[in-house]
Amino acid sequence: MAPPKRPLGLGKSAQKKKQKTDEDGVAESGSSANASELTVELNEEVDADDEVSQLFALWKTFLGAEKDNELVLNGIIHECDRLLRNSQTEKNKYKLNGEFHAIYALALNELAFFHAAKENDVKPYFDEALERIDLGLSHSKEDPRLLFSKAHIIFNRVPLEYISKMTPESSSEGYPNILEVLDDALKSYEAAQNEAIKTERFELFDQETFRVLDSLDDLLSIIDDFGKKKSSDEGIDSEDEEELGFDEDEDSLQLSESHPLKPLGESEKYDIWWRTQTIEFLKNLEKLAQKSDIILKDSSLPIGNLHRDVCKKLGQSYLLEAEEPSAIFTTLEYDSDVEDKEDGINGLQADQARDIAIQLVTEAIQYLEKAEYSDDPKSWADVAEAYVTLGNLHSVDSREQEDCYSKAEKRLQHANKATHGKYEHILNNLLQKSYDDT
């Protein structure tokens, strides 16, 4: 029997209500005239007469879609507004839980992305989204989903509302203290995590919560890239670079002390927090799998794909961190043009840099091996390349190096065969390197 379809009450609601005036806020103005045509396929376990359950199904449809659909998003906001109004009447009075308020807030948050390119100010969307969070928290003070959602909205707000308006010459005047804004988000996320663990609600460590951590990761990347020197084909010449404040030997802009992003660029706090919380998220995801008797390395299950994505992201973060000490070791060990090698680079001698790099790459491999799935040749190649990197850090012809290259070769041969030669070039380079070292 096919799952039921129905328009979620959107058409009925649209017929009864006129377009709202400005004082009613963003939510109503975001609704679409086509919302009445919106239908969603419900799972069999969803009650076709339960409008709140239907809203949850519609939200899951939006999140799971390959391409964002503004019509669906407007329909969600329209339906949230209708349900909220109905819940406040004597005739239809009923309680809306934290999940409802979280969906309403996150839908407004997502709507800001659609309007960012068309409007100068997305502030009203984020203001109203956080108002919906506060409304939900007034009824469910420690609801983890609401607290996770609050962090998500803040992590999106910073780049979309604040950083998008900044230039290299911007000063802190006119902007909030970005560190305080982010700290509010960290506090909210940690409170949500603690409550979810305390109440053993491990099902909350899902794709939606991982999107919160992803949004912070994206934000940190934006901050890292802010003021990076553009290539000559983008219209920046040497005189422009000097005027903007680029150092001659550096690729990044030197922000003034009064720039709102200056403190963030100098702090590692948020990068460390992201990794710490991502590791904690992974542990809780694995607890959920254990509690539910789920085999994680099953890519046919959503939790299996999520587990792979989290492990891969952690592995890549350790590899990225290893790049600097690896480069320092290689330069000091093999570059004959470097003078005063005994002074080291960035306070590190060759042996120190190598030890740090080995530790980081070893950590990376542990996570990448967790992300290694039997039906994913790319995951085998990712582990192989990490083993090559680790092998390059060990002494030439050492047992450790040979062991690393051997593990890499086996995986690359397997991946190359499965993909009909996709990794032939990498495999040949490894074999040639092994041959040259003998």
From Swiss-Prot:
The organism of origin for this protein: Komagataella phaffii (strain GS115 / ATCC 20864) (Yeast)
Membership in a protein family: Belongs to the ETT1 family.
Gene that produces this protein: ETT1
Biased composition annotated in UniProt, kind: Acidic residues: 234-252
GO cellular component, one term: nucleus
Protein name: Enhancer of translation termination 1
Region (Disordered): 1-41, 230-262
Cellular compartments annotated: Nucleus
Record has rRNA-binding as a keyword: no
Function as written in the Swiss-Prot or TrEMBL entry: Required for correct translation termination and probably involved in regulation of hypoxic gene expression.
Record's keyword terms, sorted: Nucleus, Transcription, Transcription regulation, Translation regulation
A biological process from GO: regulation of translation
Source species, domain of life: Eukaryota
